[in-house]
Amino acid sequence: MMVMIDFKEIEKKWQKRWEEAKIFEANPDDREKFFITAAFPYLNGVLHAGHLRTFTIPEVVARFQRMKNKNVLWTFGYHVTGTPILGLAELIKNRDEKTIWAYTELHGIPKEELLELTTPEKIVEYFSKKAEEAFKRMGFSLDWRRNFKTDDKVFNKFIEWQFHKLKEKGLIVKGSHPVRYCPRCDNPVEDHDILVGENATLVEYILIKFTTEDGCIMPMATLRPETVFGVTNVWVNPEATYVKAKVYLEKETENGIELIENGIWIMAKECAEKLKHQDRKIEIIEEFKGEQLINKKVKNPVTGKEVPILPAKFVKTNIGTGCVMSVPAHAPYDYIALRDLGLVDEIGLIPLINVPGYGKYPAKEIVEKMGIKSQEEEDKLEEATKKIYKDEFHKGVLNENCLDYEGIPVREIKDKLTKDLIDKGLAEIMYEFSEEKVICRCGTPCIVKMVKGQWFIKYSDEKWKELAHKCIDKMRFIPENLRQVFHEKIDWMKDKACVRRRGLGTKFPFEEGWVIESLSDSTIYPAYYTVAKYINQHNIKPEQLTLELFDYVFLGKGDVDKIAKETGIPKDIIEGMRKEFIYYYPVDWRCSAKDLIPNHLTFYIFNHVAIFPEEFWPRGIVVNGYVTIEGKKLSKSKGPVLPVLEVAEKFGADVGRFYITTCAELPQDADIKFKEMENTKKVLERLYLFAKEIAERRGETGEEFSYIDKWLLSRLYKAVKQYDEYMENFELRKAGILLYQLLDDLKWYRRRGGNNIRVLEEFLEVIIKLMMPFTPHLCEEMWEILGKEGFVSLAKFPEVKEEFINDEIEKGEEYLKAVMEDIKEIINVAKVQPKRIYLYTADDWKYEILKIIKENEGKTIKELMPIIMKNPEFRKYGKEIPKLVNQLIKLNAEIINEVEVLENAKEFLKKEVGVEDIIINGEDKANKKRVAIPFKPAIYLE
């Protein structure tokens, strides 16, 4: 029966000792530094399973790098900027039922404690304590002297400095700009503020101004303006509500807003509502159903051609204008709709793009090829549309129907044509969300709003983008394919609203009444970690943190004596801050989940290259997948959540750490399964009991190394080598599998009769060090019971003893396992229990052929045969040889002394398969020896 081990007591004991000894406090010295950070948590709830994965990855790597004698800086701050915490305080104050349920049932907060959290300050204080408790309970090796919150007055001064630097470079600008906006909160919203659709971006629709017979403008919304050359008709939804409205453009002037007449428009009612928020004034003249427009004609402003208005129920009026161009030669939806109306021949198709691999009419071709019968087959139509659009974008070239644009590749036309159409007054821009639903945390549907007098960070600046691309080219990315993703994000980046009217955070230094928003104050804060310990320990006041001070500390500018005098901060402290920044910066690795790629991580690169010299630019980014629980997606409001403290309580910190970092490859999503966590716990319990057993045998005299001793040591040191490589590259799952394999090797060693205390002690000492980054509490406990000095958390990484690595012994043991399995299988099939077993190894000539195969690694059978047949000795075996070569390649046979391996393991094999005797290469029973091949002996039961 398994002895119960009190993991929690072990954890408490070592957490206390680490804290008392302050072993994770990092200070500059003469060692190589290693600075690793993770995106700090937002304090509107407890740390959960998603945080656990994202934060434990750098935690494990930080501990590993300490073993490699690096001076590791690893710490955390807390993000509280913006409106979510304000919103939560209001919901709790108003006793909102859904909120009370979510925070008591899912986040595990006692109701009486939750109901006290009625102000933002109380929420920040409560959840910062909960976060600290979670980090400590999980055994995180953090330097707590550097902790801060983003509403700390001292941190606000740092953010003010950041914004002054951006403004000096012309990267903070004021103007009108489209933003995601909540009408109820009366504020732009960022990812953190959004309940549904947090990944929604702004999409630029081009409104091409077709005109009706009575001179009204009918704007066609499109993402592909080049298709205007292939329009055969336009679609409206006959059942939807449309409006005729007077449209004015709103232009900002010194005297206020000037209205410029922009014609009478016909559009969907929803579109008119949206355009009111996008620099336009709308005066509705009349409302009517779309059916009233059917069979009327409109004029294409680009080609001059008149085309009919036709009905299509697939037209969505909640996106764009509710008026859609029909291009049936290239759009499967349009072709099918026209075919259903029986109008293909009458209206005709107009091709506009030549695409390799397609005929004149790609849409017609793909619809017929896929057998699409009607508009009801939406999945097939969607698939066909995506395929054509992809092929046209990457390989298509505009044809002669595109007038002056003939010969231009599709991928290059959009910006040029859009600019030309706008310059000629034939088109305008309208903004939509990339997702249908975008809902603020307050529950209100968001809109796209053109905000006037708004402050932006000018991420569209081309020179700034060049620097960001340069940085990306020099960085390391895990996984590597992120490099291209970041290049694309930089290219697509547009100006971004950086302030809002309410919320926690830093007051905007250039105009009163604004607060810097949450994705703008969370970009360069790792630099603040390097100096936060001085600010915290020396109780430096906000007013002492001047722009000149930060210029000196982070940029080396200014006179330190003058700054010391003006700020009242002693010169040695200022110089210490500067020294610490230079020593630890840049950040070696920035870790985050993949949801932060399009915002936080991209802004992290942008802001670093704008503010710091090149030597301090980021060196690497690591991104992990999401977390699900028993197949269910995490949700803070609906569940499941799985708080970190619950993991520590139910399973233990070490179990949680080891499981969450090794249950999935880094880029993959990790699905937490509680049964697997229980199994992890059992593995750790067995390891601990093994350590206790070895501790009790201390003082025993070891023996000379036997064959099986040498095998275990070879496996051990080969694993150390491999583990080192995996951990350097954040391949934690592979490192975890390696550790499980080592524990299996130990099991096999003991099954083979291995019991040499010298070997067992060495094995245990090494595996404790390898396990330590994952399971530090248990490893400290085992280290102590073995009588080792100091903390294993500070022990040196095991040295690889190359002299013990022996491929031949390892191959021999692999061979033995295979032979044993073959014998057991034959006994099982024969359904008899033999008294003795005859084993026959291959004839010598077969080994000669294996040698030729090994010397010509990678060659095919066809290439190997002439080489083998050069030797006249082999010719007599004729047809046997191709078959043998094929078998040896498939088996991946190795050259070893099979007889020696079998003789050494004879007693073991007899015991394992339950026979009286095993005879090796004895009397050839039933002519069996002829079927033996290298690495696969023939077997005869008697």
Curated annotation (Swiss-Prot):
One of its GO terms (cellular component) is cytoplasm. It is found in: Cytoplasm. It catalyses: tRNA(Leu) + L-leucine + ATP = L-leucyl-tRNA(Leu) + AMP + diphosphate. A motif ('HIGH' region) lies at residues 41-51. InterPro entries: aa-tRNA-synth_I_CS, aa-tRNA-synth_Ia, Leu-tRNA-lgase_arc, Leu-tRNA-synth_Ia_arc/euk, M/V/L/I-tRNA-synth_anticd-bd, Rossmann-like_a/b/a_fold, tRNAsynth_Ia_anticodon-bd, Val/Leu/Ile-tRNA-synth_edit. Gene3D superfamilies: Class I aminoacyl-tRNA synthetases (RS), HUPs, Isoleucyl-tRNA Synthetase, Domain 1, leucyl-tRNA synthetase, Valyl/Leucyl/Isoleucyl-tRNA synthetase, editing domain. Keywords: Aminoacyl-tRNA synthetase, ATP-binding, Cytoplasm, Ligase, Nucleotide-binding, Protein biosynthesis. It holds the Pfam family Anticodon_1. This is Leucine--tRNA ligase.
